[in-house]
UniProtKB/Swiss-Prot annotation:
ATP binds at residues 305-312. It catalyses: ATP + H2O = ADP + phosphate + H(+). Expressed in ovaries and testis. Not expressed in somatic tissue of the ovaries including follicle cells, muscle and connective tissue. It comes from Penaeus vannamei. The gene is vasa. SUPFAM superfamilies: P-loop containing nucleoside triphosphate hydrolases, Retrovirus zinc finger-like domains. One of its GO terms (cellular component) is cytoplasm. This is Probable ATP-dependent RNA helicase vasa-like.
Length: 703
């Protein structure tokens, strides 16, 4: 400290000019001399009366601060200020927060009021941490303070400490961590609330008060531009005529309506026929031929058809025909909403796509079609629904939310559709579906038409569905499980760390020949999607990403920009394969091969739809994809594709079992026929490989 003093500061205290401090040399009378003693001491002093000057040793113990009673010397109780005991033994009462309720002396924070007012004690500035000791002349302990004034003025900031009791309840005999009251806080795990383990060892991390992701920003989707509805659909390709040879089978009790060879022969409303032509539909697909006439005849349907076969129109057209033909009310501005038709599907993107298809077919009509899904503003969706709703397309989660809040009832429901039923069950929506079907307002089974559409219907799903279908027809169209012969398949051996460079090389080759070509890149992990998408952007490609960790607004924007050509490369996780029709996808790249061969078939089915040609390129990594070799060889062989020699060798040397055993004639069979029940007719023709089955489970929540 002495190294920083100038000459004046270093001079003896006896040579100091006290008047230069702006302080009087005496107070009161001539008999009261100024105490120029220890300015930073522990005891009584400062400018007090009757004391001798003490400035020569400003750091000596003995006096008070500048006029303040420093309360040095013997240590006093922090609570009441009395000497002779410590704060933890203070007899004065304290509450559980340490606030004194019976203090002998009233102290002002920073004000330093005196318990013995006297002349010359005008003010005081103090702190609860102001005990002036030689080691810290400016105060470092919890006795009293450094201040200006006199008397007890420097005690201005006394800290109020609690008693010896528990900090939570204020009672003695235990510590806060053992408090039986707990102050409303659970002694157990912070995540699940259970006892016996810490949060870091919690076996149920998804429960309790675990810190969750930040809340998604409020998102209100833009209104659908109806002029775009008719230009975004996939047009029939050069091989569309092959659909005429797809095998079909219909089983069930009579009467069964024969297949309709044209939309005009289905007796649909003229407005619907106009929109069908405007949408570019020339003739119905096989699933439409066999399903629409029977639905219009009032039959429940369980339809099994391959992806891209026109299932959406198969249930929307008869539903819209019924609404227009019977002039069904939309119940506008009434609460709760009472839709005539309800379509439940597993994913948000699929719900949006079905809603757009419904608006396309109902264009220029009074029919109102609405959508409800998670990730978007619920109040906005309810506002649209309550403005009038004939057909509601919804995901299970958001539908249950509206149902529990009493915003929707099913008392007027005529059509119930479960689209991609097997996928909803695979994703864990079984309990939600049961809750909807068993809701107290749901119309009885005999008074509604229930339709189920899926790529496959295993026996367990058929047994479950029989509980809420009434005298249904089982319709199976096409072979499912084989790859589309309209898709050329290429498998390249690319190690993990060479995939980026190979992808860039392939994209450059593809886009040189066709700059407007759309490329869909599949990856297995969400973080890989962002990594690959960013890498492609750095290489000056127009790429975007889509996966479950992106906000709904970002997902819809990415999909919209990919549809419209703003971006011509979409890097996505497998969820994009779930039933989406995207016009113009010419190439599908499996950057990461899936773990299940059925998902592989379904992925490559995103291209080559409705008779159009397509190309799929798969990167094979021997370290992660060896389990697929035998199945890949089988799929390529059935689709008449060229099989690389290296892949055949790896398949022969593989120790993994083959899980794919070919497509067979039909994807599913009616379990009632094995029990001797059901009547019907069967039409078998030459087999054609179109589409593929549902994909395996993924770790993303898309409801």
């Amino acid at each position: 400290m002495s190294d920083d003093w100038d000459e004046t500061d270093a001079a003896p205290a006896s040579d100091w000019n006290i008047e230069s401090f702006g302080l009087p040399t005496s107070f009161g009378s001539t008999k009261k001399t100024c105490n120029t003693g220890n300015a930073f001491n522990d005891g009584e002093g400062g400018f007090d009366e009757g004391s001798q000057s003490n400035f020569d040793d400003p750091f000596r113990s003995g006096g008070g601060g500048f006029g303040g009673r420093g309360r040095g010397g013997p240590r006093a109780c922090f609570k009441c200020g009395d000497e002779g005991h410590m704060a933890r033994d203070c007899p004065s009462a304290s509450d559980s927060r340490g606030n004194r309720t019976n203090n002998r002396r009233q102290d002002n924070w920073g004000g330093g009021s005196s318990s013995k007012p006297a002349n010359g004690e005008p003010f005081g500035f103090g702190s609860a941490f102001g005990d002036n000791q030689e080691s810290d002349p400016f105060g470092a302990t919890e006795s009293s303070g450094f201040g200006f004034g006199s008397g007890s003025g420097s005690r201005g900031g006394r800290r109020n400490d609690g008693g010896r009791g528990c900090f939570k309840c204020g009672e003695e005999g235990h510590m806060s961590r053992d408090c039986p009251s707990g102050g409303g806080r659970n002694k157990g795990c912070f995540k699940c609330g259970q006892e016996g383990h810490n949060a870091r060892d919690c076996p149920n991390p998804g429960e309790g008060s675990e810190e969750k992701k930040p809340r998604a920003p409020l998102y209100i989707p833009a209104d659908v531009n109806e002029d775009e509805l008719f230009v975004m659909g996939i047009e029939a390709g050069s091989n569309f005529d092959a659909y005429a040879n797809v095998p079909a089978n219909v089983s069930g009790a009579e009467p069964i309506q024969p297949a309709a060879e044209s939309f005009q022969s289905m007796n649909l409303r003229p407005l619907l026929l106009e929109n069908i032509v405007k949408a570019g539909y020339g003739c119905p697909t096989p699933v439409q031929k066999y399903t629409i006439p029977n639905v219009m005849n009032g039959r429940d349907i369980m339809a099994c058809a391959q992806t891209g076969s026109g299932k959406t129109a198969a249930f929307l057209l008869p539903m819209l025909h019924y609404i227009l033909d019977n002039n069904c009310p939309s119940n506008a501005f009434e609460e709760p909403a009472q839709p005539t038709g309800l379509v439940i599907c597993p994913t948000r993107e699929l719900a949006i796509q079905i809603m757009r298809e419904a608006r396309k077919f109902s264009h220029s009509s009074v029919a109102k079609c609405c959508v409800a899904y998670g990730g978007a503003a619920g109040f906005h969706q309810l506002k649209t629904i309550h403005s009038g709703c004939h057909i509601l397309v919804a995901t299970p989660g958001r539908l249950l939310d509206f149902l529990e809040k009493g915003k929707i009832v099913f008392s007027s429901l005529k059509y119930l559709v479960l689209d991609e039923a097997d996928r909803m069950l695979d994703m864990g929506f079984l309990s939600s579906i049961k809750t909807v079907i068993n809701h107290k307002t749901m119309t009885p089974t005999a008074e509604r038409i229930t339709l189920m559409f899926s790529a496959t219907f295993p026996h367990e799903i058929q047994e479950l569905a029989s509980a809420f279908l009434n005298n249904y027809l089982f319709v199976v169209v096409g072979t499912v499980g084989a790859a589309n012969t309209d898709v050329k398949q290429e498998v390249l051996c690319v190690p993990k760390f060479e995939k980026k460079a190979k992808l860039v090389e392939m994209c450059e080759e593809i886009l040189i020949s066709a700059d407007d070509e759309k490329i869909l890149v599949f990856v297995e992990q969400k973080r890989v999607a962002d990594f690959v998408g960013t890498y492609l952007c750095e290489k000056k490609f127009r790429a975007t990403t889509m996966h479950g960790d992106r906000y709904q607004a970002q997902r819809e924007q990415a999909l919209s920009e990919f549809r419209t050509g703003v971006h011509n490369i979409l890097v996505a996780t497998a969820v994009t394969a779930r039933g989406l029709d995207i016009k113009g996808i010419g190439v599908v790249v499996n950057y990461d091969l899936p773990k299940d061969i059925d998902e592989y078939v379904h992925r490559i089915g995103r291209t080559g739809r409705l008779g159009n040609r397509g190309l799929s390129i798969s990167f094979y990594d021997d370290e992660t994809d060896a389990c697929l070799t035998k199945d890949l060889v089988k799929v390529l062989s059935e689709a008449n594709q060229t099989i690389p020699d290296w892949l055949t060798q790896k398949a022969n040397a593989s120790g993994h079992a083959q899980t794919y055993h070919g497509s067979g004639l039909f994807a599913s069979s009616d379990i009632r026929s094995k029990n001797g029940g059901g009547r019907g007719w069967e039409k078998n023709q030459a087999s054609s490989f179109l589409g593929g089955p549902s994909e395996s489970n993924v770790d993303e929540e898309w409801d």
